Design a protein with these regions (language model features):
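Gram-negative host-targeted secretion-system effectors, predominantly Type III and Type IV
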Residues: 1-148
Length: 149
């Protein structure tokens, strides 16, 4: 799934690995961006939830700002840490397990999304719909390219 996404910069190592590699500042910048992304998700939900329904396309503004990879990573992190919570749909929890989020000395708890789980579940579904649309468009473009060859 990640291979077809635009090349969005994400630092792949834990803080300990970054320290060992002499790249701690790069890790810190990535970590701060993960935290900001989690905050942007909370703000988008606050903006687009009317008390009963989450506005369609709520995830798009956050995706436009932070990219598919980072938004997916931050969402997966929250669902993985809340795997016990029955308010998340099983398909969303299963999706979250397809994304590797390393244990990082407790740092991953810092970019945990604090929105209500039932509403966040709707945001995750909206994100996944956006991702599926991207995949469909990418597949269609590849098919069109094959037809012109």
């Amino acid at each position: 799934m990640w291979s077809m996404l635009p090349n969005e910069a994400m630092y792949p190592y834990t803080a300990k690995e970054a320290r060992d590699r002499g790249e701690l500042e790069v890790w810190r910048a990535n970590f701060r961006t993960n935290c900001a992304c989690a905050g942007a998700i909370e703000l988008a939900i606050h903006r687009d939830f009317d008390g009963m329904h989450l506005k369609d396309g709520c995830a798009k503004s956050v995706i436009d700002q932070y990219g598919y990879r980072r938004v997916g990573y931050v969402l997966a992190n929250t669902l993985q840490l809340h795997a016990y919570d029955g308010r998340y749909h099983e398909t969303n929890k299963r999706w979250s397990r397809t994304i590797f989020v390393p244990e990082d000395g407790g740092h991953r708890y810092t970019f945990l999304i604090g929105s209500h789980p039932a509403v966040l579940d709707g945001f995750v579904s909206d994100y996944r719909a956006e991702l599926e649309q991207l995949q469909a468009n990418s597949n269609q473009a590849m098919s069109m390219g094959e037809m012109t060859m």
